[in-house]
From Swiss-Prot:
GO biological processes: mismatch repair
MF (Gene Ontology): ATP binding; ATP-dependent DNA damage sensor activity; damaged DNA binding; mismatched DNA binding
Cross-referenced Pfam families: MutS_I, MutS_II, MutS_III, MutS_IV, MutS_V
Function field: This protein is involved in the repair of mismatches in DNA. It is possible that it carries out the mismatch recognition step. This protein has a weak ATPase activity.
Taxonomic path: Bacteria, Bacillati, Bacillota, Clostridia, Eubacteriales
Entry-linked PANTHER family: DNA MISMATCH REPAIR PROTEIN MSH1, MITOCHONDRIAL, DNA MISMATCH REPAIR PROTEIN MUTS FAMILY MEMBER
Protein encoded by which gene: mutS
Source organism of the structure: Clostridium kluyveri (strain ATCC 8527 / DSM 555 / NBRC 12016 / NCIMB 10680 / K1)
Protein name, as recorded: DNA mismatch repair protein MutS
Cysteines joined through disulfide linkages: none
Positions of region (Disordered): 801-825
Residues reported in the UniProt entry to bind ATP: G616, P617, N618, M619, A620, G621, K622, S623
Family: Belongs to the DNA mismatch repair MutS family.
NCBIfam families from the UniProt entry: mutS1, PRK05399.1
Keyword list, A-Z: ATP-binding, DNA damage, DNA repair, DNA-binding, Nucleotide-binding
């Protein structure tokens, strides 16, 4: 037995789309077969059935109505699946044999354009990564959002950390990679990003110049590296392959240099809760959640980009700050802008729908009503004097011609469907007007006929109706059948309580009305397409106006946040000093009642105040303080006012954090190993213009090991000539406070604590000097540990504090509980340990530390620590 002709057609199409769920159109349904059916039935909670396919066993099958496909497709795509839409390409009634079918679109997580399933305040990026294995290790990354037309490219010498940081910045839903990508590189990406990966053949990376020139007119490819051309070309090819159409709104090839923006690595972005909270992964509880007061979807997405890519160009930062200040100082214009922006729809994504020819008449009206507000925005902008706002006023296109076209052509309340008519206004097309009049007159004639037939037949309940199957009919209830004029009425349909008839004159008018309606629908559709195509030719103008509006919205949002939260305008300096007077954590402050947050000063540079060594108990506020310094810096560099009484910020190129501890069990890495890798990454990649936050370095191992590592890291940061960057270093190792005065740049600070009736009160104030004790047991008491545990902890602490601080851990004798006896084997164990210790000491003595890199040093240290733990 062989496959049936229809199933053979299915298998031939499926062969070319193996990585997709194939939605195969059969009549009014999309059907799925075999493994696709099993997957879809499970994911969409559909009934799994079977169908004869010509084989011994039936083919598993499930299906969905084609008119409800949108919601099912959205659910599958959001789960990471790709959907290939296979349509009937000819009328089944007219075809001979198997209906011709073909793929009209492939919908993937990175190419989905349905606004119902997209987050309006977040871009839906698809990314392509290309690594050149032949010429060194250069690579290129390209990111596109086909819902808005955005297309960004960059290149860099290969560095997995840099690649991961860029991916994290754009957060793509789908990543296109080479078929032969190095498995270790892929594993490194997969460990961090659990997104859809699409492997493509090498042919996608060929003829990139030709592909890019066709998509981006007047693009000078000589400005770009071969890696960018291959990467960008592959991404355009993939988009065209899946969308099966040219997308004119993807028209701006935007190159950016990674070093033109403040780099915030993955760990820092997460620890600082920049765009989402650490606990719930939501906007609320993040920096973005505090300062996002935007009124449009476009503005929300733009502000997110600003936060992901803070500036390092002082002039650009000052342009934004000056604009925010001017908006803030003109409260009336501020409110007027807010009101005008509130009524603007998502112009960027509407332009994308126009370009992809998926826009409907109601959405064109949304564009029209948005354009209607642009003159109001332009009038408000004319009142400002700062250079950025003046340029926005100058370049904002009011799009009056597009508004006039849409206002003249599209009905105020049109049909959603383009195949039902009711789209075009009276006066736009004379033939459409004539047919509409004929349609109205025909229906008036029907109403008149109904009235006259009631008169003639004396049947008061007689009525004329219509349905798509039988057309127009005269309906008479069975109780009145004796009054029917059988010589004129022709029976059409019998119902349980009525009969339906037609007459020759009714049939004649039906042909006229339906003919007019069919032609009217056809003409209205064509007129709509004509209008849409005219608007599509102006997509670039629409996008430029949308971009300006989104940036105005961002500046207005930052002004609103500054007003509501009492922020100050920071001074942006070219020095190496950061001075913050009465600084506050923007997110924590936002969660407390007004006035509850305790502000703190910060004075840090690359000279005498290079490394602030912060001691104090847990829960006292060390981490909050360190994070607020980083967040104030980020806010200043996006052009925002900052939570402080005053602030002078030197421009930072990178921010690194080592905060918190967690095992990476999936990769077999302990807390300490993860910590050491992160510290190593910081020391290798930081520059003298970076800001480093280190919290409890060394806590993942034994006390003296951790102390030694922390001490060594401080020395390296302060003494390495290429580093010497601004650093906040929180620690429990009070011994480190001795470094002030011994290592240039180290300054001791602590969190003040007050004891009241044997209880501690955290004052949250950062003051000069080191902490005299850690208050760890008091914190444990606050956490509710049993009194027996606390009592025993105090006994041990008192014993430890009486011993010499120089004494090694091996020689420390912890106090034993009462009635506890020593084991008889301890003496023998100590003799064996002495030999092991001697060997380890000799190994350490032979280490040539001056000829080791930081990473080699950490690896050697890790080996030593493992040996110590085994002794």
């Amino acid at each position: 037995m062989g496959l049936t002709p229809m199933m053979r057609q299915y298998m031939e199409i499926k062969e070319n789309y193996k990585d997709c769920i194939l939605f195969f159109r059969l009549g009014d349904f999309y059907e799925m077969f075999f493994d696709d059916a099993k997957i879809a039935a499970a994911e969409l909670e559909l009934v799994l059935t079977a169908r004869e396919c010509g084989l011994k066993e039936k083919a598993p099958m499930c299906g969905i109505p084609y008119h409800a496909a949108k919601s099912y497709i959205g659910r599958m795509v959001n789960k990471g699946y790709k959907i290939a839409i296979c349509e009937q390409l000819e009328d089944p009634a007219q075809s001979k044999g198997i209906v011709k079918r073909g793929i009209i679109k492939v919908i993937t997580p990175g190419t989905y354009m349905d606004s119902y399933f997209l987050d309006e305040n977040e871009n839906n990026y698809i990314m392509c990564l290309y690594i050149n294995n032949n010429e060194g290790s250069n690579c290129a990354l390209c990111f596109a959002d086909i819902s808005t037309g955005e297309f960004n490219c960059t290149d860099t010498p290969f560095n997995l950390s840099v690649i991961l940081d860029e991916i994290c910045k754009f957060n793509p839903r789908e990543i296109i990679i080479q078929e032969d990508i190095d498995s270790n590189i892929l594993q490194g990406i997969v460990e961090v990003f659990n997104e859809t990966f699409s492997r493509v053949d090498e042919c996608y990376f060929q003829k990139g110049e030709e592909v890019l020139r066709e998509q981006f007119k007047d693009l000078n490819l000589r400005e770009y590296t071969p890696e960018i051309i291959k990467c960008g070309g592959a991404l355009v090819k993939y988009i065209k392959h899946t969308q099966k159409t040219n997308l004119s709104h993807i028209n701006k090839f935007q190159y950016y240099n990674i070093v033109d923006y403040l780099t915030i690595d993955i760990n820092s972005k997460r620890n600082l809760e920049i765009v989402e909270s650490l606990r719930e992964s939501k906007k609320k509880g993040s920096l973005l959640g505090v300062i996002d007061k935007t009124n449009t979807s476009m503005g929300g997405r733009q502000l997110r980009k600003w936060i992901e890519q803070p500036l390092i160009d002082r002039n650009k930062i000052m342009e934004r700050l000056d604009s925010v200040e001017e908006i803030l100082n003109n409260i009336c214009y501020h409110e007027d802008l807010k009101e005008a922006l509130k009524n603007i729809y998502d112009i960027e994504r509407l332009a994308g729908k126009i370009s992809s020819k998926s826009v409907n008449a109601k959405e064109l009206n949304s564009l029209k009503s948005s354009i209607e507000k642009i003159p109001d925005i332009k009038v408000i902008l004319s009142n400002f004097e700062t250079s950025l706002l003046k340029n926005m006023y100058k370049n904002l296109d009011e799009l009056k011609d597009i508004y006039m076209l849409l206002d003249k052509a599209i009905l105020d309340n049109p049909s959603v469907s383009l195949k039902e008519g009711n789209l075009i206004k009276e006066g736009y097309d004379s033939e459409i007007d004539r047919l509409k009049e004929a349609k109205v007159k025909g229906k008036d004639w029907i109403a008149s006929l109904e009235s006259s037939e009631r008169e003639l037949t004396k049947i008061k309940s007689l009525k004329i109706g219509y349905n798509k199957v039988f057309g127009y009919y005269i309906e008479v209830t069975k109780s009145n059948l004796n009054l029917v004029p059988e010589h004129r009425y022709i029976r059409k349909q019998t119902l349980s309580n009525a009969e339906r008839y037609i007459t020759p004159e009714l049939k004649e008018m039906e042909d006229k009305i339906l003919g007019a309606e069919e032609k009217l629908i056809y003409l209205e559709y064509n007129a709509f397409v004509e209008v849409r195509d005219k608007v599509e030719k102006e997509v670039t103008r629409i996008q430029n106006s949308a971009r300006i509006i989104s940036e105005v919205d961002c500046l207005t949002s930052l002004a609103r946040a500054a007003l509501e939260n009492n922020y100050c305008k920071p001074e942006i300096t070219l020095s190496d000093r950061v001075y913050i007077e009465e600084g506050r954590h923007p997110v924590v402050e936002n969660m407390l009642s007004t006035g509850e947050f305790v502000s703190n000063d910060t004075d840090i540079d690359t000279g005498e105040n290079q490394l602030l060594l912060i001691t104090g108990p847990n829960m006292a506020g060390k981490s909050t303080y360190m994070r607020q310094v980083a967040l104030v810096t980020i806010m200043a560099q996006i052009g925002s006012f900052v939570p402080a009484k005053s602030a002078s910020i030197s421009i930072c190129d990178k921010i690194f954090t080592r905060i918190g501890a967690s095992d990476d069990l999936a990769s077999g890495k302990s807390t300490f190993m993860v910590e050491m890798w992160e510290v190593s990454n910081i020391l290798k990649n930081a520059t003298n213009k970076s800001l480093i936050l280190l919290d409890e370095v060394g806590r993942g191992t034994s006390t003296y090991d951790g102390l030694s590592i922390a001490w060594s890291v401080i020395e390296y940061i302060c003494r390495e000539s290429k580093l010497r960057c601004k650093t906040l270093f929180a620690t429990h190792y009070h011994e480190l406070t001795k470094l002030e005065g011994k290592i240039k740049g180290v300054k001791n600070y602590c969190v003040s604590v007050k004891e009241v009736e044997n209880n501690i009160v955290f004052l949250r104030k950062i003051i000069r000097g080191g902490a005299d004790q850690s208050y760890g047991i008091e914190v444990a008491k606050l956490a509710g540990l049993p009194e027996e545990v606390l009592k025993r902890a105090r006994e041990i602490l008192n014993s430890l504090e009486t011993e010499k601080t120089e004494e090694s851990m091996e020689g420390t004798n912890l106090p034993k509980k009462k009635k506890e006896e020593k084991t008889s084997s301890q003496g023998e164990q100590l003799k064996f340990l002495d030999i092991e210790k001697e060997n380890l000491i000799n190994e350490i003595r032979d280490i040539d530390i001056l000829n080791m890199t930081p990473m080699e040093g950490f690896n050697k240290l890790y080996d030593i620590i493992k040996k110590v733990k085994s002794i």
